[in-house]
Each structure stands twice: as C-alpha cells, then as structure tokens.
C-alpha cells in the first residue's frame, strides 16, 4: 500500500466534507441531512464566537474543575526505573472522566439551536452520566441508550444517571453493548429530528461530530503542553492514551501532532487476544468500512457485517474507531497497539498500590503500555499519559475477577 504523502500539518483536517484522507465523511439517512448541516452551521459559528468560548471556559473552570492537574507519578517512575511518568488527571473532573469536557460544549450548542430534548449513547456509563449531568444543569430532559450488557456491568453509573433525572433505556439488540446503543440513539434521532439533540460521546459519527468532539477534548492536550513546559521546560518524548472510539486520545494527541520529537501511541483493547474475535482492536485487526455515519477502521467479517467485540472495559468495547485516528494510523503519525485484558488488570492494581489512584479500566490499558515502555527509555525521557477516568465504576468488575467480592 502506498503511504499517503505527509501533510504540511497533521492538525488541519477534516476537509469541508468532513474527511480525513479516505476516512470520515457523513453517511446518514436523508431525514437527518438537514439537521446535520444545521449542526455544522451552528458549530462553525459557535467555534468563532467569543461569547461561546467565554461561556465554555467559565463552565470549564467553575463546573468541571479545569485545568486538571498534571501529576508526576514518582513511585511508579522509581519502580519502573526508566522514563519519568506524568499523568494528565482527567479522572479528577466533575463526573470522574474526560467525558464532561465534550458534554458541556455540546449542550451549549444544543441550547443555541433551540433543542428541547437530549439523547445520548453510553458504554461504560461515563458519557451517560456526563450527559445526564449537563442536561440537569441546563434543565433539559435526557434519554440515555445503553446496551443491556453494559447496564448490568456498570450498575453504579446507571443509578447515577437515574438520580440525575435521565431515563436509561437498556438495548437488548446484538450483544447489548455500545454499538447497539448507538444504533438505537440514531433511530430515536431520525424520529424526533425537530426537538432532539443527539449528544455523541466519542470522536466518531457523521461530520461534524468527530471534529467537534476533538475540539472540545483538545483542552486536555493544550493544558498538558503548558503544564509540562512549566514543570520540565520541554515537551514529552512519548504521549500515550487508551482508544475506544477515541475522544480522550484525540484530545491529548491533537495539540502534539505537529511536534516532531513527540512520539504518540494509542492503546486499543486487545481483549482475550487478537487470534479470535474477543477483542476491540479495530486498527490492529480491522479493515475500513462504514458505521454510524462515517468511514473508518471496523471489526467486520468478509461480508461487511460488524463483529461483536469484547473488552474487560465497557468504554473500549466499540467495534470501530474515530476517523481521525484511522487517518493518523495510515499516515504513520500515531502508532496503535493492543493491550490484553489481563495486562490492563495488572496495571490497574499496580497504580492503585503504588500511587493511591484507582484508575478506570480504560486508562489502565494505556498504563499497561506505559509500564512496558518506560523501563526501556532513558531516565531523562518523559512519558505523558492521559488518565482519562477514575475506577469507582469498575471496582465490582475487578473484585469479581480477583475474587475479592463480598
């Protein structure tokens, strides 16, 4: 396969059709097209509107708790004996993950568009909680679609959503996971186009969602860049984040894409291994196709039917990936690697024991890769990792596996 030509900037996309190279675009039902174009129009106005930016920054500071800290993991660094490890502490945000950054941005857009009802899809429940949270903050009704399997394994987040006033609709189709929840949300949206805003939680879906979600999440990388320059006087040698749909990863990656000396690694869910179907490594083991309104790498069979992936982490359990990640992989700017369930589980325990931080299973995948790479790097080198969510929601899953349940 011919390598695409290196662009002048890795940060210029998407083009006016929402494409990153051959990926992205907007493949939607005819009934949704006017709404998508309206959304794009509003987004183009909002992102250049100083009033919108000011409101976003104010809510970021006083509601989310930004900037999130940059934390030097001293004991983990000493234990591994190599590169210095810094965490961007997104798990300290209101609601416990990076998801709120995007939700605040999108609900402000929904208000601008005069929408009176919010729908969302969720896997781990973190995006559902963040959507229910902003809907409560702005007084809008909210319906969250969640795969029945995920409802079961993420019970604390289901309860949180209900407490916040959201209606949680379990989806039993397919394997009852994130893909199926997204399908149901899209069906709802087609039926209720006038009143409803679909608050997509990851950097996927039809244009302008991948760009919009990335821009709302890029605050992570922008802050981390400034914070690391203040702490170390230079940029990191390596940036690492877990990738499901890819919003936390693109948020920390994007501001570093044009910095030549910075290597970037996205960590996919390797599940129980890549030889079978029980994983969610769309880039490592998938092929290009169209799902949920955009062209990207997918887990699909020879007939183009979407496979049901598996990950110990509900938030990485998606058979696709954001189109910008697909492009960054093909152009060679970002390296994507799989981490298995058992490796993520070990990393989860390591961080808890050494730093007193209980991470979510999603960033535990990124951490497992950091644990592999840090000892092979020099002590003068720096790794920046996005600690995208806290592990409260996962303690029962982990407890069950480790035989530590009640």
Swiss-Prot record:
<dbReference type="Pfam" id="PF00291">
    <property type="entry name" value="PALP"/>
</dbReference>
<keyword id="KW-0663">Pyridoxal phosphate</keyword>
<dbReference type="GO" id="GO:0005737">
    <property type="term" value="C:cytoplasm"/>
</dbReference>
<comment type="subunit">
    <text>Tetramer of two alpha and two beta chains.</text>
</comment>
<dbReference type="InterPro" id="IPR006654">
    <property type="entry name" value="Trp_synth_beta"/>
</dbReference>
<keyword id="KW-0028">Amino-acid biosynthesis</keyword>
<comment type="similarity">
    <text>Belongs to the TrpB family.</text>
</comment>
<dbReference type="InterPro" id="IPR023026">
    <property type="entry name" value="Trp_synth_beta/beta-like"/>
</dbReference>
<feature type="modified residue" description="N6-(pyridoxal phosphate)lysine">
    <location>
        <position position="99"/>
    </location>
</feature>
<dbReference type="InterPro" id="IPR036052">
    <property type="entry name" value="TrpB-like_PALP_sf"/>
</dbReference>
<keyword id="KW-0822">Tryptophan biosynthesis</keyword>
<protein>
    <recommendedName>
        <fullName>Tryptophan synthase beta chain</fullName>
        <ecNumber>4.2.1.20</ecNumber>
    </recommendedName>
</protein>
<comment type="function">
    <text>The beta subunit is responsible for the synthesis of L-tryptophan from indole and L-serine.</text>
</comment>
<comment type="pathway">
    <text>Amino-acid biosynthesis; L-tryptophan biosynthesis; L-tryptophan from chorismate: step 5/5.</text>
</comment>
<dbReference type="InterPro" id="IPR001926">
    <property type="entry name" value="TrpB-like_PALP"/>
</dbReference>
<keyword id="KW-0456">Lyase</keyword>
<dbReference type="InterPro" id="IPR006653">
    <property type="entry name" value="Trp_synth_b_CS"/>
</dbReference>
<dbReference type="GO" id="GO:0004834">
    <property type="term" value="F:tryptophan synthase activity"/>
</dbReference>
<keyword id="KW-0057">Aromatic amino acid biosynthesis</keyword>
């Amino acid at each position: 396969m011919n390598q695409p030509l290196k662009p002048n900037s890795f940060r210029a996309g998407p083009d006016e059709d929402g494409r990153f190279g051959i990926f992205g675009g907007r493949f939607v039902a005819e009934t949704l097209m006017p709404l998508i174009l309206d959304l794009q129009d509003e987004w183009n106005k909002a992102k250049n509107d100083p009033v919108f930016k000011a409101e976003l920054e104010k809510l970021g500071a006083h509601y989310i708790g930004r900037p999130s800290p940059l934390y030097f993991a001293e004991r983990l660094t000493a234990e591994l004996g190599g590169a210095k490890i810094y965490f961007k502490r997104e798990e300290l945000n209101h609601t416990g993950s990076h998801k709120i950054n995007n939700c605040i941005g999108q609900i402000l857009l929904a208000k601008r568009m005069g929408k009176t009802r919010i729908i969302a899809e969720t896997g781990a429940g973190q995006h559902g909680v963040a959507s229910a949270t902003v809907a409560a903050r702005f007084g809008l009704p909210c319906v969250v679609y969640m795969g029945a399997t995920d409802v079961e394994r993420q019970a604390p987040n289901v309860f949180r959503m209900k407490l916040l006033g959201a209606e949680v609709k379990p989806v039993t189709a397919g394997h009852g996971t994130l893909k199926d929840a997204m399908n149901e949300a899209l069906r709802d949206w087609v039926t209720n186009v006038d009143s409803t805003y679909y608050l997509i939680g990851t950097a996927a879906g039809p244009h302008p969602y991948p760009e919009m979600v990335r821009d709302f999440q890029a605050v992570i990388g922008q802050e981390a860049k400034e914070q690391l320059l203040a702490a170390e006087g230079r940029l990191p040698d390596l940036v690492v984040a877990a990738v499901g749909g890819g919003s936390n990863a693109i948020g920390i990656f994007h501001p570093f894409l044009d910095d030549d000396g910075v290597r970037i690694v996205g960590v996919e869910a390797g599940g129980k291994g890549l030889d079978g179907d029980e994983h969610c490594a769309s880039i490592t083991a998938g092929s290009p196709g169209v799902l949920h309104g955009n062209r990207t790498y997918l887990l699909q069979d020879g007939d183009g039917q979407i496979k049901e992936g598996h990950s110990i982490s509900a938030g990485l359990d998606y058979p696709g990936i954001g189109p910008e990640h697909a492009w960054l992989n093909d152009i060679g700017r970002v390296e994507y690697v799989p981490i298995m369930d058992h490796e993520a589980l070990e990393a989860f325990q390591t961080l808890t024991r050494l730093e007193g931080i209980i991470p979510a299973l999603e960033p535990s995948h990124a951490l497992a890769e950091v644990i592999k790479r840090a000892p092979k790097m020099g002590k003068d080198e720096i790794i920046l990792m996005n600690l995208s969510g806290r592990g409260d929601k996962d303690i029962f899953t982990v407890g069950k596996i480790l035989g530590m349940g009640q």
